[in-house]
């Protein structure tokens, strides 16, 4: 006999990273609902649980890569470095869980295989990887933007006698000491791993798929005075973050690059190069790096000049210089280009010399050279946004799967709901704000909580968005993206890191402040674009 007290909930949350932890707290502790959160991992942390690779750390500053809702934990947490590393990040998130007593309502080592909406009883039925069944009135997906790893298909994988790993599924006991290591990928993760691995491996071979614009991170230990200043100005700092575009805690420039002299531009670029941070360099130098070709060219030329200045071997420097626009997600780490001056580091440019196959001993490139390896690391990223959902079978009205609903491209209304899937919400769903993630997560969690709280007060069992609202939001996001330079470069932020997949808009590029204003506008209009009703058989408008 099923014990409904243990298997039925007001809400179920999938995921226990930044989004899932706060969502559980919001629904349980603030709204008083009966909630259970599930995670396939054996600990909380989401992407920060899985990404244990050497060098793993945030590339947004520590004081803003955290919650603002939990001032007490932040004030009691004296971080050591400008950028929090993976172990410290897990410690912080666990401290939040402990402070708010959330552990008793988190079920770990339990993935969700399916979620099906029952139109008669208007509840979600979930099947877990452990064979259990649970039901809930509300389903909140907090599964993350970057969860499902991507490993490119390379001939000969079954021949390789060494070890193959992905940075997003790093074994805790894996050491690089004394090993010949190869790495494919030079994105945000790749540059961090390369710099760390160069200090540990006997030899490191970097297989570069595309050259990367990388600025220094300015990583360093922070002083007690630095931490104290943040704590003393907590509210003011967070007010500025919420009312900014990128939400990274620095002053975003309002000056056009071409409105100043060449001498002044170089001074500004040099100043921000010395301070460090990728988002700061793109958005703190000038206001139009991401939208104006001339401004973008100026920034690109500056970084390319730095590469040629830093890298001693001219041929290596040539390979490291990007030839496209500076319009991918900004990347930063300390000493990236300096790493290629080390005697134990070599670079292979895959556009010029592709991988032919893996052999028993390593990687064979088209020039006939066999690069002998003990370990091959894929820093090749994730299936952005939709990958997390593709790992589950989610069925809404009429039995339609989410995969079918998103067959052309993932879409949503405001990044939080999709038509035909009543009482299902998403944190960081498709076309959420392109910004520092924790402030964006908080904005959505708080808004979803307000919507559910409002519906509970109205005794309304069903909340769903309309197709018209979803289509209009998708069109808005496409229009804003087209105004920027980002779509002009092949990148994971448009899902183009998946073989055979065409470009699709996955983010709202209008800034966090603009996004929050839209959320407030919709709420103030009695949640315009949503239908709240008691008839579960009602058709979506």
From Swiss-Prot:
<keyword id="KW-0285">Flavoprotein</keyword>
<dbReference type="GO" id="GO:0042742">
    <property type="term" value="P:defense response to bacterium"/>
</dbReference>
<dbReference type="InterPro" id="IPR023753">
    <property type="entry name" value="FAD/NAD-binding_dom"/>
</dbReference>
<feature type="binding site">
    <location>
        <begin position="209"/>
        <end position="210"/>
    </location>
    <ligand>
        <name>NADP(+)</name>
    </ligand>
</feature>
<feature type="binding site">
    <location>
        <position position="112"/>
    </location>
    <ligand>
        <name>FAD</name>
    </ligand>
</feature>
<dbReference type="Pfam" id="PF07992">
    <property type="entry name" value="Pyr_redox_2"/>
</dbReference>
<dbReference type="GO" id="GO:0018667">
    <property type="term" value="F:cyclohexanone monooxygenase activity"/>
</dbReference>
<dbReference type="InterPro" id="IPR036188">
    <property type="entry name" value="FAD/NAD-bd_sf"/>
</dbReference>
<feature type="binding site">
    <location>
        <begin position="186"/>
        <end position="192"/>
    </location>
    <ligand>
        <name>NADP(+)</name>
    </ligand>
</feature>
<keyword id="KW-0503">Monooxygenase</keyword>
<keyword id="KW-0521">NADP</keyword>
<feature type="binding site">
    <location>
        <position position="492"/>
    </location>
    <ligand>
        <name>NADP(+)</name>
    </ligand>
</feature>
<feature type="binding site">
    <location>
        <begin position="59"/>
        <end position="60"/>
    </location>
    <ligand>
        <name>FAD</name>
    </ligand>
</feature>
<comment type="function">
    <text>Involved in the biosynthesis of phenazine natural products including myxin, an N(5),N(10)-dioxide phenazine antiobiotic, which has antimicrobial activity. Catalyzes the aromatic N-oxidations of phenazines, such as 1,6-dihydroxyphenazine (DHP), 1,6-dihydroxyphenazine N(5)-oxide (DHPO) and 1-hydroxy-6-methoxyphenazine to produce DHPO, iodinin (1,6-dihydroxyphenazine N(5),N(10)-dioxide) and 1-hydroxy-6-methoxyphenazine N(10)-oxide, respectively. Also catalyzes the N-oxidation of 8-hydroxyquinoline, but not 6-hydroxyquinoline (6-HQ), quinoline, quinoxaline, quinine and 2-phenylpyridine.</text>
</comment>
<dbReference type="GO" id="GO:0071949">
    <property type="term" value="F:FAD binding"/>
</dbReference>
<protein>
    <recommendedName>
        <fullName>Phenazine N-monooxygenase PhzNO1</fullName>
        <ecNumber>1.14.-.-</ecNumber>
    </recommendedName>
</protein>
<keyword id="KW-0274">FAD</keyword>
<feature type="binding site">
    <location>
        <position position="39"/>
    </location>
    <ligand>
        <name>FAD</name>
    </ligand>
</feature>
<keyword id="KW-0560">Oxidoreductase</keyword>
<feature type="binding site">
    <location>
        <position position="65"/>
    </location>
    <ligand>
        <name>FAD</name>
    </ligand>
</feature>
<comment type="similarity">
    <text>Belongs to the FAD-binding monooxygenase family.</text>
</comment>
<feature type="binding site">
    <location>
        <begin position="47"/>
        <end position="50"/>
    </location>
    <ligand>
        <name>FAD</name>
    </ligand>
</feature>
<feature type="site" description="Transition state stabilizer">
    <location>
        <position position="329"/>
    </location>
</feature>
<dbReference type="GO" id="GO:0002047">
    <property type="term" value="P:phenazine biosynthetic process"/>
</dbReference>
<feature type="binding site">
    <location>
        <begin position="57"/>
        <end position="59"/>
    </location>
    <ligand>
        <name>NADP(+)</name>
    </ligand>
</feature>
<dbReference type="InterPro" id="IPR050775">
    <property type="entry name" value="FAD-binding_Monooxygenases"/>
</dbReference>
<dbReference type="GO" id="GO:0050661">
    <property type="term" value="F:NADP binding"/>
</dbReference>
